[in-house]
Amino acid sequence: MRDFSFADDVPTAWTYHRATARWLFNASAGGESPPVRPGREDGGLPWTPLPEGAPLQSSLADTLRARVSCRCFAAEPLTLAQVATVLRASYGSDNRSGPVMQDRPPPSGGGLYPLEVTLLVRAVDGLEPGVYHYVPAADGLEQVQQLVLPRPFLTYLFMGQPWVAEAAVVVVLSFAGGRSLTKYGDRGYRYALLEAGHTMQNLNLAVAALGLGVVNLGGFYDDELAVLCGIDVDQELPLYCCALGRPAADPSDRMAMRALERGTPDG
């Protein structure tokens, strides 16, 4: 059995990684930081301010232990307060640096925060089903479109993952390239992937601390998801998603969760 080879076995991944590699002859300190807005804000869309969030009272140690993937969700809505807590903990702005930089929980290359957050809402008290865009600087949600998201469509969109269709909310992280690539060139794409990972882990920990369930999603049809979210893939790219809701059983009880996934009673 031969050894694995990046170049031979996964040439597309190899080409991407080498194309964004740095050596002495092509390294630079990066360009000037471009003028940036705190984030995309379409304006004129129906607006929902976020309420006071649900409290996070779990210790860090307990939260880390509780963070597991949940693939069985109960048919119960989330509260808007729970959604507010999750959004603020993952990518919310605390205005520590004033209205321009808008410091947020995850580390970000150059402090440019190039990610955008879109919600596909099925069941949240206080929100109509549909697509919403989170605006951290104003701490609220723009309603991109009101629509019921059919279960078969969500399962299809996320490449046959049926648990997505049972979740209360799907969170979509997308990358607004102009915010960081102008400064860092193609290397900035790596930084965006890292930031998406940091952001999603923050989200996972907030969900765990609230006693809710979450599963991360890397498989989806990119262009169709972008159309649903109302984003232009020439300027903004979906990177990473997750489905969250109330778990049908304690997510840390792996035997119970696996039994639910199989559709059989526990024990």
Predicted region positions:
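N-terminal accessory segments that position/regulate proteins before the catalytic core
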Residues: 1-178, 196, 219-267
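Short acidic/His/Gly/Ser-rich catalytic and metal-binding motifs that mark active-site loops
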Residues: 179-183
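Short pre-catalytic strand/loop immediately N-terminal to key active-site residues, enriched for Gly-Thr
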Residues: 186-195
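C-terminal substrate/ligand-recognition segments
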Residues: 200
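Structured binding elements
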Residues: 211
